[in-house]
Regions:
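Membrane-interface helix-boundary motifs at transmembrane edges
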Residues: 1-2, 66-75, 133-136
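Membrane-interfacial loop-to-transmembrane alpha-helix junctions, especially the N-terminal start
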Residues: 8, 72-81
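Membrane-water interface at the C-terminal end of transmembrane alpha helices
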Residues: 118-136
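Core segments of alpha-helical transmembrane spans in multipass integral membrane proteins
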Residues: 16-17, 42-67, 83-87
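Cytosolic juxtamembrane helix and N-cap/initiation of the first transmembrane helix
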Residues: 1-17, 132
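Hydrophobic alpha-helical membrane segments
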Residues: 77-95, 116-123
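Membrane-helix boundary connector in multi-pass membrane proteins
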Residues: 90-112
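Hydrophobic transmembrane helix segments
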Residues: 14-52
Length: 136
């Protein structure tokens, strides 16, 4: 069950780091994801900060789930973590494809968001494949 707990800790750490980044440097996140400087304003920064708080909520809930898992419920917990990574991944891959962009602001075909979405989908698959502890 150590493998499952380590994978859960990975999710917790990533969420905490992203949360700190979003709370304390929202403009940097926006520029990293290709937002033009003229669209980075206090409203956009506050929205990113809100998502930073949400990332901390994910980290805290993940920490709680990790501390309460047993051999009986570890598979269900890992499935929840896999589902969370799946949703993050689908958002990253499809968000730029579904939005209507003003002319000149269209994201590149293979942007940071798309790349991170693919990475998150891989995390989802890993979490799902390793959801059961090895039998003793």
């Amino acid at each position: 069950m150590n493998t499952q707990k380590n994978l859960m800790m990975f999710t917790i750490v990533i969420s905490a780091i992203y949360g700190v980044w979003a709370i304390f440097a929202p403009g940097h996140i926006l520029s990293t994801y290709g937002t033009p400087p003229e669209l980075i304003n206090p409203l956009a920064n506050n929205i990113v900060m809100l998502f930073g708080v949400a990332a901390w909520v994910v980290a805290i809930l993940g920490w709680h789930i990790r501390s309460t898992i047993t051999e009986v419920n570890v598979e269900k917990a890992m499935s929840c973590f896999a589902l969370a990574w799946l949703l993050y991944g689908l958002h990253g891959v499809f968000s730029e494809k579904v939005l209507t962009w003003p002319e000149g602001l269209e994201p590149p075909a293979f942007s940071e968001s798309t790349i991170s979405g693919i990475v998150f989908l891989v995390f989802s698959i890993v979490h799902y494949m390793l959801r059961k502890p090895k039998s003793s």
